Amino acid sequence: AIIGAANSLIRHNRDRFPVEGVPIRRDADPANPSLVVFDGEKTEKESLAWFVKALLHLHKAGRGWEEFAVLYRSRQSSRAVEEALVRAGIPYRVWSGVAFYARREVKDSLCYMRMLTRGDDAAFLRTVNSPKRGFGPKKADALKVLAMREGISYYEALKRHIDEKPFNTKAIREYVAVIEKARASAAARKVSDVFNLIMADSGYEASLQLSGEDERLNNLAELRQAIANYESDADDPTSLPEFLQRASVFAEDIGEQKGPAMKLMTIHAAKGLEFPVVFLWGFSEGIMPSSRTSTMEEMEEERRVCYVGMTRAKDLLILCHSQGTSEASTFRYPSRFFFELDRNLVKLVRPLEPGLEESAKEALMYKDKFLTGEPLESSSWRPGDHVRHKVFGDGEIIAVAKSGAMTIRFPTLATPRTLMAGAPLERISTAGAPTVADSSFSGAPVPEPSAEPGVKDQK
């Protein structure tokens, strides 16, 4: 079923003659064939809960941890998976890459936040010259001598001697001013606000933008999402020290783990490898394929990448999709590649929501016109229009992109959502017209994960 499903996908490529895979395993059990499973959840939190439940179920049934692999399109997608595995106590290793909380930009950002609480020497040395402020090894050595002699931290020594050479430079003074300003307000702010403040005022995020390091910016966005998830999950207002304590658990080094462990890696790193059980994570439009896909040629390459990911599985392939990363995140449809698969070869964990497939295909049709360069009909939607969505309720359009995608503010959600062109919307009133009263959330209740993951043991 896995090879058959992958072949049904790659047949949609037109520019190159598709090379289809042929099942050649001699040890395959005809009574227990390979299986393709699709799991679609409302939120990433629910998707992770089902993922962990499926892992534990399969492990209890006899699967060793070394038999599992999680593959993803890009490295930033590993963050949520790593956190879920740490919480569940499931051993894993990140192959051909670095664990999320060990990545440079993530460690730098967390150290900036640590400077607002403890101001420890390790956090100071990591942040004082990131971005570059002319604080090299000579200045660091001179500061260490002062700190040791006076029995204080490096940062306190810097503040005490800020008017002396070689520390009295404009850039170093600005660093101290940024830390002191953020410290003064951190206790009264949400963690997410503190993070945004320190990233902006320190110039750290801007330095990544100027460098063009998209992957590092994506990891920074993932850390921002982790903070938002932490705040939404907490019953009480969270403090910065509490968040840093939680992050430290995920940041512990797991590289020296001994014994069997799951493998996490990008699809690119998995080329040439095979695993008994594969979870293809982020099987959502905008992730797989990437939202940056702008031509049909690029879309065909995305399809080939997906084909490679699918064919890494020997016994069981699980395609994991969630409509959003949180209750307030951007709405996502399942990957277009899901709709291209031979559905006779795919087992659904639960039925698709009524109307989801039709609305997704309508939106994807509009995107395909954009990819092929066909003239797009001028969007009838304008900022200020009031609309009704069958799941999110009533909202107001606040922006319309050239591609037709719309950013909509729904009173029932904490932040605006971006919906693809062609999303099923009912017009309530046009921009400038009187609006109706905000309606309450009218979406169907989210189904609870089943008692069992709905996946038969595959050996």
Show where each model-derived region lies.
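Helicase P-loop NTPase motor core
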Residues: 1-91, 114-118, 375-378
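Flexible glycine-/small-residue-rich
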Residues: 37, 72, 266-269, 282, ...
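Well-ordered alpha-helical segments embedded in enzymatic catalytic cores
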Residues: 47-54, 108, 222, 305
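Conserved helicase C-terminal RecA-like lobe
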Residues: 64, 78-84, 88-90, 103, ...
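Active-site-adjacent beta-strand anchor residues
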Residues: 71, 95, 102, 281
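A generic "binding-loop/recognition-motif" signal
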Residues: 74, 97, 131, 269, ...
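Conserved RecA-like helicase motor-core motifs
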Residues: 89-99
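C-terminal accessory regions
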Residues: 148, 282-415, 421-452, 457-459
